[in-house]
Amino acid sequence: MTPIVFGGRFGWLHVGHGSHGVVLCNPFGHEEAWGHKAMRYLAEELSRRGIPVLRFDYLATGDSVGIDHESDRVDHFIVDIGAAIERLRQETGVTKVTLCGLRLGGTLAALASHHPLVDSLALLAPVVNGRHYLRELTALRQTWVENLPVVVRAVQVDSPYHVLGQVYSEAFRSRLSGLDLGKAMSHQSALPKRVFVADLRPGASRSLCNVLLDRGVDVQTEAFDDYFEFMQETASSVLPEKTLKRAAQWIEEGVAEGMARDLKPARARKAARPSMSDDAIIETPEAIERPVIFGAAGLFGILCEPRDGLPGGPVIVITNTAGSVHQGDSRLSVRMAREMAQRGIASLRFDARGIGDSPARSPDGTHDTVASIHAQTTIEDVATAAAWLKRKGYDNVVVFGICSGAYSALRASLIEPAIGAVIAVNLQRFHVPEHLTLQELRAQRRNTMARLGPAILKPQKWWLVLSGKRGLKPILKAFASNAAARLQSQMPGVTRKKVVQADHGSLTDPHSIVHALERKGVRTLLVYGAGDEGLDQLNAHFGRHGKKLSRTTRVRAAVCGDVDHALYDTRALATVIAMSDTFIKDLKPESAPVMEPIAPLGVSPQL
């Protein structure tokens, strides 16, 4: 697959040799990050079958240019799909195109299917009724708000309206509320010959299918059986291989039928861009962004450099949060990178192995069906990214991460000399055994002091224990562990000997890790939202809100009342960006930088 940029839109071209191609249309908002691995998997599955594919980000989404909360975007997205069709034709010579979309992407694909090259549609759990879709979004937002710590919940506002970080303008919501895909398709001037629909519930797309059938379209419907295991936060999401392979098979069958009908099939170029071109540049008002491939594993990232920045200077490595692609949940990492560029600071947002657009973790290229969010390979890849940037001449490499991304940032700083500073937001633990499953980790989080403390005063909680519905042993173990940590925090000298003797990468004790950061000279800022469960370990080992870290010279903690766990609230992201800007500009460069230019085609030498 090859990264390309067209009209400010970032995309990936997957090679094929036929005259029939596919354009994949992304879902929107939080579902874009949740659905990314499925879209990549489908593109690769089609490419293996010899079908050229273009998957891309609409303007104002993903890595493309544009601000993501401006006005109503529906018509703009339809134009973007038309531009993608034309670019696929130019690159590969295809004469027919299938549009395939997931969720709102399926809706947009249908609305764009009047394009003369489009002969078929594959719709995966399409949004057929806009009002129902908005109700789903509202329910999801309400669930998120209800699960916030009380302090953070109290400061939430309804405007700007956002769902898991994606802002929806009033104009956009108004447009969505009036969306009836069946009605829209009944008035569309031209329709494709064939349509495949994978429904998340039986009959969910009946109104649309009836309209298409009445207008003579060949419609095939199937159940999206693995939808609900798939469409959830990336840490838990399971790749829906069954449905994706069925969709690819249906598309391939249509391609074969078309070739059989055409006595003289159009010839298409067999290959499309075997490597990155130097025109794959994303230009925004504040930055120049380039796709880069680096390291022995061929990791992928976007290097974002300020337009007016001087050579060298500080640079931020923005890590993956859970299994989310380098763009971040609801485009958070893109917004942060471009905001920091406006402040004169460069950044690299990249994907570790097994995540986003980087290679799989497995040597045989097999994709993980479920993300491994605390994998040692992720820590190694963060270290590789930092070392690569240091070689490029940046004087201070700062690694930034949220939750599991904070963990990989912190752990990488223990093993990579190139890392000069770390900004860890809502770090849950200083050490997570790699063998610990996500389910086991979540079970342990049920017994944090933030949850157990208030529960002690609630009789109904004790009734769960007395009735056997909640185990007493894990609760007692949690209290004992917390008490032991607090006792140890009164004797800071106990762990110093371990730091000298142990390999920094294998350290497990929070005190030893902090002492190692001190010895290595890594400036560290630990940022927490008020009430975040990560405070449990910080408070136990370093006093309330980490006050005992004042004994150190390089490690500090800050607790903010308006910061939610994932920085979905736009004000929380703004707060953390401002703190990061101040922190980075206070760093002292080690030496004058000597810049190594980015290699031709955007592909950087392997380390």
What are these regions (language model features)?
Residues 100-109, 125, 400-409:
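Gly/Ala-rich beta-loop-alpha elbow adjacent to hydrolase catalytic centers
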Residues 38, 69-91, 365-391:
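Alpha/beta-hydrolase active-site loop
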Residues 16-57, 306-352, 361:
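Short, surface-exposed "cap/lid" segments of acyl-processing enzymes
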